[in-house]
């Protein structure tokens, strides 16, 4: 018969010390916490936690070993109007578990209990927490420590990036192991990618609504266990755990000089709204973990049914501990925070919020690359430019300005230039560096680059929501024909804009983020919200990749790394050597010229040597070049002999870079 001794309130979670397992669980409002141990046959033993220190319940299991399955039952008041939803009939997952065994199905035993406790026991249906204790030989692994000024981010999904790669063994495709495969690493190195940003690899589940439709949460933002590696992306090879496989991938990428950033989800949990499943925090301490309205309802500022209360001292520490676990255990180099405004809610957004202060005070985490998606859907949720020093931010204003300039002819060149210069009005006056602007034309959420040029309307019918989901504000242009089938003239204009947008992204000041597949011409058939499409719609089709576009993109990244104005991560100042803004005649743009409607032509001289020529009009133009001898540079052509170019004739929707001869 298992007996728990008092144990210790630290360390948090379930930890094997060589002689037994120490268990801890936070709950400020519980009246009793019961540890539930399960054997291999699923038989349950319930043991009351024998000690409480402050709000930490704890106990020690002598002789306990790694592999022990467990969960919790928590007793206390069921008073929804006060935010309390305790129910000992529901087995609960440890919010700090580092592994889970099993999946969460659409089981009615998880739901119910909206106005009164549901008495159906959920233990048989719930995945069990696993105590793990895995040693790992990092073999001297060190972080690549890429300076922000040299950083080029590649946003990718583990499965989508590798599932159809012909040079990766079939049994490894779609897995963490595929990320470590030489063929994938060679692609990243050839492109010039410095930093791989992975969509969530934390343990996530599929919403009941999707399960009923036979779909799944492909993107993975419905996180249940943020400390646990998602086993869905593991190869299942004997003797190799999901954690080890991810570690192997990070080590291989580091050996190639490539950083790894994880997209993490701390804005909401997989328990959804009041009608959602009771799996974890709702039953452990609902009032502490979630933002609630005065009458106890969930304050749905995320659009996902609930919002985590990250200003609570314990919840703040839970996030910090989780980030440090991923950093220490998996050697990741940074984090991208989904719906990042929630991180600073107190409940209003505050640059000095507890979580921001804790991140700044943590030497290890403050040295990581930290990236915020600077919005949520709550009051005051749009916070682009307002995150504290140490954060970079996804810049949707850059995205919309560049799309509008090239595809809609509705953005004046002054606005274009301001965002080309790392959206300086947003970041410079707030003491941030240019790298704080994460520039993007596309991301996982929205059209791919090719679809941006082929579809004026979203086509999300496969998502099962009658095309209601996804944004209608895409700033796209199909050039007169909806879809991928079009005549040669339309495709010529599309391809010109495709290259112009890639060039703009990769030669703008700030930190560029390239969506995986955009360099290949990947299409999602007009679906701009493919969160539930775990199929060939989202998987990159390496067999039909546009090789010429891949070469073009690689040449652009190499060019970027040669231009000091783009890599030194310092603001451009009027009159310095970093930048000169010129008109189509090669003359400095006057203040009046900046304000002349939607002028779509300009020249940008970077570091006194690289001349970016821009014709975003729908007709050919001729530009007079500044004084000097100019020649083409890859990927824009190379002169076979010395030639003094005085003019440049540019086709519609084109951009070109020339280099000044010494």
UniProtKB/Swiss-Prot annotation:
InterPro entries: GlgX_C (IPR040784), GlgX_Isoamylase_N_E_set (IPR044505), Glyco_hydro_13_cat_dom (IPR006047), Glyco_hydro_13_N (IPR004193), Glyco_hydro_b (IPR013780), Glycogen_debranch_bac (IPR022844), Glycogen_debranch_GlgX (IPR011837), Glycoside_hydrolase_SF (IPR017853). GO terms for molecular function: glycogen debranching enzyme activity; hydrolase activity, hydrolyzing O-glycosyl compounds. Pathway: Glycan degradation; glycogen degradation. Signal peptide: none annotated. GO terms for biological process: glycogen catabolic process. Its EC number is 3.2.1.196. Keywords: Carbohydrate metabolism, Glycogen metabolism, Glycosidase, Hydrolase. The active site is at 338 (nucleophile), 373 (proton donor). This is Glycogen debranching enzyme.
């Amino acid at each position: 018969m298992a007996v728990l001794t008092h144990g210790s309130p630290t360390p948090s979670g379930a930890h094997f010390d060589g002689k037994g397992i120490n268990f801890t669980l936070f709950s400020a409002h519980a009246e009793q916490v019961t540890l539930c141990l399960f054997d291999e046959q699923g038989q349950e033993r319930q043991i009351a936690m024998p000690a409480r220190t402050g709000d930490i319940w704890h106990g020690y299991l002598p002789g306990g070993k790694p592999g022990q399955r467990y969960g919790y039952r928590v007793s206390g008041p069921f008073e929804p109007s006060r935010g309390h939803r305790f129910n000992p009939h529901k087995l609960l997952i440890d919010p700090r578990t580092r592994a889970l065994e099993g999946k969460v199905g659409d089981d009615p035993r998880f739901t119910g209990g909206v106005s009164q406790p549901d008495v159906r026991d959920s233990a048989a249906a719930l995945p069990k927490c696993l105590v793990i204790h895995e040693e790992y030989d990092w073999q001297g692994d060190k972080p690549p420590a890429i300076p922000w000024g040299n950083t080029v981010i590649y946003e990718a999904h583990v499965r989508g990036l590798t599932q159809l790669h012909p040079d990766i063994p079939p049994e490894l495709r779609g897995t963490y192991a595929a990320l470590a495969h030489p063929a994938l690493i060679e692609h990243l190195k050839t492109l010039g990618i410095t930093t791989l940003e992975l969509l969530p690899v934390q343990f996530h589940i599929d919403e009941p609504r999707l399960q009923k439709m036979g779909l799944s949460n492909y993107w993975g933002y419905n996180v249940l266990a943020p400390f646990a590696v998602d086993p869905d992306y593991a190869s299942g090879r004997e003797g190799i755990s999901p954690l080890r496989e991810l570690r192997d991938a990070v080590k291989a990428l580091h050996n190639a000089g490539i950083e790894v950033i994880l997209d993490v989800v701390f804005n909401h949990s997989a328990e959804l709204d009041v009608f959602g499943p009771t799996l974890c925090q709702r039953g452990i301490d609902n009032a502490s973990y979630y933002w609630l309205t005065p009458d106890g309802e969930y304050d749905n500022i995320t659009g996902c049914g609930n919002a985590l209360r990250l200003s609570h001292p314990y919840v703040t520490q839970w996030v910090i501990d989780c980030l440090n676990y991923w950093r220490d255990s998996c050697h990741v180099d940074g984090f991208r925070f989904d719906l990042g405004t929630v991180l600073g809610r107190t409940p209003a957004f505050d640059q000095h919020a507890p979580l921001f202060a804790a991140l700044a005070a943590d030497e290890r985490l403050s040295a990581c690359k930290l990236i915020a998606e600077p919005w949520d859907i709550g009051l005051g949720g749009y916070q682009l430019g307002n995150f504290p020093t140490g954060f970079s931010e996804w810049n949707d204003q850059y995205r919309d300005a560049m799309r509008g300039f090239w595809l809609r002819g509705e953005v004046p060149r002054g606005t274009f230039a301001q965002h080309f210069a790392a959206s300086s009005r947003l970041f410079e006056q707030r003491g941030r560096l240019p790298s704080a602007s994460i520039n993007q034309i596309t991301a996982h959420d929205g059209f791919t680059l090719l679809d941006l040029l082929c579809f004026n309307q979203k086509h999300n019918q496969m998502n099962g929501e009658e095309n209601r989901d996804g944004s209608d504000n895409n700033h796209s242009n199909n050039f007169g024909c909806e879809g991928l089938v079009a005549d040669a003239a339309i495709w010529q204009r599309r391809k010109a804009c495709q290259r112009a947008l890639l060039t703009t992204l990769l030669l703008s000041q700030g930190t560029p983020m390239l969506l995986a597949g955009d360099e290949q011409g990947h299409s999602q058939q007009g679906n701009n919200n493919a969160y539930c499409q775990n199929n060939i719609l989202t998987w990159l089709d390496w067999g039909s990749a546009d090789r010429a576009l891949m070469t073009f993109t690689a040449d652009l990244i190499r060019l970027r790394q040669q231009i000091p104005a783009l890599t030194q991560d310092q603001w451009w100042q009027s009159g310095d050597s970093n930048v000169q803004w010129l008109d189509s005649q090669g003359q400095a743009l006057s203040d009046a010229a900046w304000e002349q409607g939607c002028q779509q032509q300009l020249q940008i001289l970077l570091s006194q040597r690289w001349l970016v020529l821009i014709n975003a009009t729908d007709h050919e133009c001729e530009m007079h070049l500044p004084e000097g001898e100019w020649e083409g540079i890859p990927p824009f052509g190379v002169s076979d002999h010395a030639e003094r170019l005085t003019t440049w004739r540019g086709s519609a929707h084109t951009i070109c870079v020339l280099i000044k001869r010494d």
